[in-house]
Amino acid sequence: MPARRGVAFACVLVLATPLSFAARTAIGEPATSPGPRPLRAEIGVEWAVGTRDGESQKLRLHVEPELDLALPRGFRLKGIGRLRADAFDELEPGQPDQAEIAPYTRRLDFGDRVDAELRELFVQGRIGPAWLRVGKQQVVWGQADGLKLLDVVDPQSFEEFILPVFEDSRIPLWTVDVEVPIDDAQLQVLWIPDTTMHDIPPRDGLFAFTAPRLVGEGPPPGVPVRIEDPNRPSDPLRNSDVGARLAGFWKGWDLTANALWHYDDIPIPFRTIDLDAGVPQVRVAPGYRRTPVLGGSVSNAFGNLTVRGEMAAQLDRWFPTDDVTDRDGVVRTTDVGWVLGLDWYGFTDTLLSAQLFQSFLTEHRPGVIRDQLDSNVTVLARRTFRHETLTVETIWIQSINDGDGLVRPRVEYAVRDDLQVWAGFDVFYGTRDGIYGEFDENDRFVIGFEWGL
């Protein structure tokens, strides 16, 4: 309890300072931004309060120092660290074992409420015509908003489901990234000797997965279940990932062709049923399997309208089945997904965006716990005011198949270039069987800030 009060006091104190500064700036006090420096830092606080029970879900302080140093021959060394302190420890209670994370990529835990992490550390520069970046980094594929399709190079932390921005929820990996020009195109080649997978919330976490399509159907009442830790591949050489992307421009269209040989970052709930003792016993041993990905993206602007598209075929994906006669409780198939996005800028200072995500299983056996064609729709409305310093937006994500979804209204104010404050709501709806509806009790109000130092 003293530790919680201490962290909470520090977070509230830091939170109050930029909010009062924002109020003074709004009534006319001048503010200036610091110039570029090789060593910078960002400090921020976000407070999330459940709207149903009034209980705090998190009050988290984060400090992110950033290094940018010039090296000989035009190379640069860049690094980002992150220190976090949470007053309530509801997202991942206790000290997570981080079984899904490779040892050289894990966070350092200091008790239950404080952790430190090396987010990025890489050297980049040119060698002849090639551009090289080596080290811990993020690799971004695709342009979809709200949900992901082609952006599968880096795994993701799901401690707050899909609520954080992708830049914060991605788990940077140790990667060799080489980009070489080929005529008017650009070839990117990746080698990733990092066996980190998605960071899945523990079963007592606030956003722990419970939807059957993610974790499989539960056994009948009274049947004991033993769930083991995920069996993560551990050899950084033999189990490394490789990928390539060819990007170019043709008749007004930005085009990419993408290929990735990697492990699916979602643990597969392999299941066995033991009948030897006379009473059925269920054992779930999550594991990972290779999933080749082939895809691409297109985009073009037609006046005020931008058209975006992505496609990704995951050739070997495993899905849970409720067929009790199935040997391991999962089936293998090919998952072909695509997204079509339209961005309209026809109104002053306004963006209206809509996306259709669809995923099709080429083989859909009886008992598979998801429809053969799965569809989601997203709608984004964003308007800026006061010379683009005040942003008001709402994003709506809707599952067509399950009827559940997520609505996220938000207001953000840029007090100055290095100080932003915001407030908003995250509202889930639907049944517990849906990917969004499983968090229907977790609706929340959030307020926070980020301040560059």
Protein language model annotation of sequence segments:
Residues P30-R52, F75-L83, V392:
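Transmembrane beta-strand segments of Gram-negative outer membrane beta-barrel proteins
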Residues L39, G74-L77, P129-L132, D184-L187, ...:
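Repeated loop/turn-to-beta-strand initiation elements of outer-membrane beta-barrel proteins
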Residues I43-V45, V63-L69, G79, E120-G125, ...:
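Residues on the lipid-exposed face of transmembrane beta-strands in outer-membrane beta-barrel proteins
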Residues V45-T51, L83-A87, I127-P129, Q138-V140, ...:
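Transmembrane beta-strands of outer-membrane beta-barrel pores
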Residues V49, E55-V63, V114-R119, R170-W174, ...:
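Residues that define the transmembrane beta-barrel architecture of outer-membrane proteins
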Residues F75-L77, L83-F88, P93-F209, K251, ...:
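Outer membrane beta-barrel
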Residues P155-F158, F439-L453:
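Outer-membrane beta-barrel "beta-signal"
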Residues L260, S299-I397:
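Detector for outer-membrane/organellar transmembrane beta-barrel domains
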